[in-house]
From Swiss-Prot:
This is Proteasome subunit beta. Residues 1-8 form a propeptide. Component of the proteasome core, a large protease complex with broad specificity involved in protein degradation. SUPFAM superfamilies: N-terminal nucleophile aminohydrolases (Ntn hydrolases) (SSF56235). It is found in: Cytoplasm. Its EC number is 3.4.25.1. The lineage of its organism: Archaea, Methanobacteriati, Methanobacteriota, Methanomada group, Methanobacteria.
């Protein structure tokens, strides 16, 4: 059964002084097969909330659609933006309601305040300053533990996140095929283009 499921692997999220940064590689695996080399693993929920996925691609895509709908519904009912913590709680409730083979990072900005949450397939929710998910996370955490400090900016955070994904891609056979990199600041969401990502990779 497991070799019939498309899986996404290594993702990273880091809180910074001025925002939250996210990075992932792009490989989707089916057992030992590299099924896709351009998998999307970072998703914009709205201008101040972003999620990443690791696990079953089908479950993850379904979860993203539900989160987007729930967040939009909240904002229509309350005529206000949903907080990052509330969006994480909504996601946790969705995961508790039915089995989904996916681990999600959800983070963003409430005004000037960055926050980041990890959500497991059973709906467990943990807030932290930096988090990695997926099969390459054990390698990525080595980089994060070594380089993270509380005063980092998003520019520094982007470099650390890419470095962590690069290390995971070199050691984990289920990670690789390039990078997706994004950030959220008080000015909104940005998915970095290929040129900016290549500039970061060149520095490390």
């Amino acid at each position: 059964m497991d070799d019939k499921i498309l899986e996404g692997t290594t993702t990273v999220g880091i809180t910074c002084k001025d925002g939250v940064v996210f990075a992932s590689e792009r490989r989707a695996s089916m057992g030992n097969l590299v099924a896709h080399k351009v998998a999307e693993k970072i998703f914009k929920i709205n201008d101040h909330i972003v999620t990443t996925i690791a696990g079953s691609v089908g479950d993850a895509q379904n979860l993203m659609k539900i989160i987007e709908a729930e967040v939009s519904l909240y904002q229509m009912r309350n005529n206000d933006k949903i907080s990052v913590k509330a969006a994480a709680s909504v996601t946790a409730n969705i995961l508790r309601s039915g089995p989904m083979y996916v681990q999600t990072l959800l983070g963003g900005m409430d005004g000037d305040k960055p926050s980041l949450y990890s959500l497991d397939p059973a709906g467990g929710m943990i807030e932290d300053t930096y988090i990695s998910t997926g099969s390459g996370s054990i390698v990525a955490y080595g980089v994060l533990e070594d380089r993270y400090h509380e005063e980092i900016t998003t520019d520094e955070g982007l470099e650390i996140a890419v470095r962590a994904i690069k290390a995971a891609s070199e050691r984990d056979t289920f990670s690789g095929n390039g990078y997706l990199v994004a950030k959220v600041t008080k000015d909104g969401f940005e998915m970095l283009d290929k040129e900016k990502v290549n500039d970061i990779v060149a520095k490390i």
